C-alpha cells in the first residue's frame, strides 16, 4: 500500500507533553502545564452546566448546522447566520479552506514562523508554500505582497501571531487588503482575539463588508477555555461560505461542544475577568524580563515568547525536570527561546522562580 505522495515524509503535528506523561517520566506529584496557551482559569460555569444538560442526548447525532450556536455567534458578531462556517476547532476551518482552494499548481503565502497547520494542510493538497520570514517577530506585509502572483490562492495572517504574540494593526491590515489582488483569499486567524487589548488592534469583522475575499477565523479553545471540546469558526461573505460548505464534514461539531460554546459566549463577564488577569500577569513577565536583560516580544495574547540566547531545548528541559511544561522555540522556528503560556499568579510565581534560578546557574543574571 502507498499513501499519496504529499503525505510521504510529512510529520504529524507534535503537541506539547501531557501532564500525566511528565508525571510518569520524572516522578513528580504536581505539574504546571504552560505549553499550549490554554486558559488557566478554566471555562465558564455556564458552559459546564450546558454540558451536563446534554448528557442524556449522547446517542443522538448533533445538529449538523449548529443552529443555536450559529444564532448566538451571528448576533454576537453582528453578521448573518449564513456567513458562518463551524469547525471541529479552527484547525478544521483551516483544513476546509485548504481543501476548497488549494491544489497542485496553486500557491499559498504565510509568515514564518507562524501557526504550522497552514503549511501542513497546504502540503497535503500539494500546493506550493511560500513562507516570508518575520521581521522583529512581526509579519512583513510588504514582502508577503511581493510573492503573491496569479497562482496564489490563500494568504494567511495569524493575528496576533503564534508563536510571537505580535500583531498587525488596523492601518497595516487595511493597507494590505487594499493591495491584495481580488482573486486571493485573505484569512485572518484571530484565535487570540479576546486577549488583544491594543487600541489599534483591527476590528476585522466589519471589514467583511468592504473586502469580499476576507475570512476571519476565531475559536472557543483559548479565552473561552473549551479546548477539549474543539469548536472554531470562520466568518466570511455568504457567497464564500456557500462555496466552501461542501468541503465540511457532516456533524463536525458535537452536541456538547455546541451547547458549551453557546453558553460560554453568553458569559462575557468571565472573558473580561480572564483577560484582565492575563494582562496583569503578562506585565509581570515584562518587568521580569527587563530587569534580567531578557529579550521578549510584546504580546497581545495569553503567551509570551522569551529569548534566552540559549538553546531553547535546554531551557525547556530545565523547566520540565522541575515540573513546568513550556514550549521550546526549537519546535517553533525560534531556536534560542521558549514560549510560555501566561498562567495564574501562583503558576507564574513558580516559573519566574525557576527562570531566576536558571539565570543564576548560567551566570546570566
UniProtKB/Swiss-Prot annotation:
Swiss-Prot/TrEMBL cofactor(s): pyridoxal 5'-phosphate
A biological process from GO: L-histidine biosynthetic process
Catalysed reactions, as listed in the record: L-histidinol phosphate + 2-oxoglutarate = 3-(imidazol-4-yl)-2-oxopropyl phosphate + L-glutamate
Gene3D superfamilies: Aspartate Aminotransferase, domain 1, Type I PLP-dependent aspartate aminotransferase-like (Major domain)
N6-(pyridoxal phosphate)lysine modifications at: 222
Keyword Cell cycle (UniProt): no
Entry similarity comment: Belongs to the class-II pyridoxal-phosphate-dependent aminotransferase family. Histidinol-phosphate aminotransferase subfamily.
Gene: hisC
GO molecular function: histidinol-phosphate transaminase activity; pyridoxal phosphate binding
Protein keywords: Amino-acid biosynthesis, Aminotransferase, Histidine biosynthesis, Pyridoxal phosphate, Transferase
EC number: 2.6.1.9
Keyword Amino-acid biosynthesis part of the UniProt annotation: yes
Protein name: Histidinol-phosphate aminotransferase
Oligomer status and interactors: Homodimer.
Pathway: Amino-acid biosynthesis; L-histidine biosynthesis; L-histidine from 5-phospho-alpha-D-ribose 1-diphosphate: step 7/9
Source taxon at top rank: Bacteria
Any coiled-coil regions, as ranges: none
Record-linked InterPro entries: Aminotrans_II_pyridoxalP_BS, Aminotransferase_I/II_large, HisP_aminotrans, HistidinolP_aminotransfase, PyrdxlP-dep_Trfase, PyrdxlP-dep_Trfase_major, PyrdxlP-dep_Trfase_small
Amino acid at each position: 500500500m502507498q499513501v499519496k505522495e504529499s503525505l510521504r515524509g510529512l510529520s504529524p503535528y507534535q503537541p506539547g507533553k501531557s501532564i500525566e506523561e511528565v508525571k510518569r517520566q520524572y516522578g513528580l506529584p504536581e505539574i504546571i502545564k504552560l505549553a499550549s496557551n490554554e486558559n488557566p482559569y478554566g471555562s465558564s460555569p455556564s458552559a459546564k452546566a450546558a454540558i451536563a444538560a446534554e448528557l442524556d442526548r449522547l446517542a443522538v447525532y448533533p445538529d449538523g448546522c449548529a443552529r443555536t450556536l450559529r444564532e448566538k455567534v451571528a448576533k454576537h458578531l453582528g453578521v448573518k447566520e449564513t456567513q458562518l462556517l463551524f469547525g471541529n476547532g479552527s484547525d478544521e476551518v483551516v483544513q476546509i479552506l485548504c481543501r476548497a482552494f488549494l491544489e497542485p499548481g496553486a500557491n499559498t503565502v504565510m509568515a514564518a514562523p507562524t501557526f504550522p497547520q497552514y503549511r501542513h494542510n497546504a502540503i497535503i493538497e500539494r500546493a506550493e508554500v511560500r513562507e516570508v520570514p518575520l521581521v522583529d517577530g512581526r509579519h512583513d506585509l510588504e514582502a508577503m505582497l511581493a510573492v503573491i502572483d496569479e497562482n496564489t490562492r490563500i494568504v494567511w495572517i495569524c493575528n496576533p501571531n503564534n508563536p510571537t504574540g505580535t500583531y498587525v494593526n488596523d492601518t497595516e491590515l487595511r493597507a494590505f487588503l487594499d493591495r491584495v489582488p481580488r482573486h486571493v483569499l485573505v484569512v485572518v486567524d484571530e484565535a487570540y482575539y479576546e486577549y488583544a487589548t491594543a487600541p489599534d488592534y483591527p476590528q476585522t469583522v466589519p471589514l467583511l463588508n468592504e473586502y469580499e475575499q476576507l475570512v476571519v477565523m476565531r475559536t472557543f479553545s483559548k479565552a473561552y477555555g473549551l479546548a477539549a471540546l474543539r469548536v472554531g469558526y470562520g466568518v466570511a461573505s455568504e457567497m464564500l461560505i456557500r462555496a466552501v460548505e461542501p468541503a465540511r464534514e457532516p456533524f463536525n461539531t458535537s452536541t456538547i461542544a455546541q451547547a458549551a460554546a453557546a453558553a460560554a459566549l453568553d458569559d462575557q463577564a468571565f472573558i473580561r475577568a480572564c483577560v484582565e488577569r492575563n494582562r496583569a500577569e503578562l506585565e509581570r513577565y515584562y518587568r521580569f524580563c527587563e530587569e534580567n536583560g531578557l529579550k521578549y516580544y510584546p504580546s497581545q495574547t495569553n503567551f509570551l515568547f522569551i529569548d534566552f540566547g540559549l538553546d531553547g531545548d535546554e531551557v525547556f528541559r530545565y523547566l520540565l525536570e522541575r515540573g513546568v511544561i513550556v514550549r521550546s522555540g526549537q519546535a517553533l522556528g525560534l531556536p534560542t527561546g521558549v514560549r510560555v503560556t501566561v498562567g495564574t499568579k501562583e503558576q507564574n510565581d513558580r516559573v519566574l522562580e525557576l527562570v531566576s534560578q536558571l539565570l543564576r546557574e548560567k551566570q546570566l543574571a
